[in-house]
């Protein structure tokens, strides 16, 4: 897609990178008798070699362990917290380590992850939560006003059904995981990997440091998920 757009003389910023934090990485490193950073360094080298062999010409390759990313994630977390959208609560439920996903009892069959069919772990811990429920109405309005925002149609319908159902606040920190970005105001917590990792799309564009570049390329014209 980036090659096609460049061939049409359009200004393209193609971003890729690696998601390097979380319990899955921590456990994989332990199994290899390596520190987490040693483990991810080896994996990143393989990815970069692969992209080169495939002639994939990205404009930036961001690692979520880089200082530019970690620093900006902390800043964004603080901004959300100052806006009153983060609070400390307690999570009790099921967690899939390979998928790094939380599940409730009703979503499980024989206590297997709905995504990968592996066994899930029972978790009970203090977490920071994001007030997603506060934005249910605005999310629904956005998707109804922009019918082509998500494609294909089947995925759009799936998401709309989830938004129309009761929307729960989501856990955005872990108190039992050391390998991650620390919550700025509470170093006993690390920021949940799916919050940390997904923010790379804007941290790589210089959010809060290089706003000229950020405003030039964000929001993204195309965001491929999968």
Which functions belong to the PLM regions below?
Residues 79, 95, 102, 112, ...:
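The −1 position to Zn-ligating cysteines in a subset of zinc-ribbon hairpins
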Residues 84-90, 120-122:
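A short alpha-helix-loop-beta-strand transition element characteristic
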Residues 26-28, 107, 205, 209:
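Hydrophobic alpha-helical membrane-insertion segments
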Residues 90-92, 109-110:
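Short metal-coordination and nucleic-acid-contact micro-motifs, chiefly zinc-binding Cys/His arrays
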Residues 103, 119-120:
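Cys/His-rich microdomains that often coordinate metals
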Residues 1-87, 100:
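N-terminal Rossmann-like or analogous alpha/beta NTP/dinucleotide-binding catalytic cores
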Residues 1-16, 63, 68-72, 98, ...:
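Structured secondary-structure scaffolds
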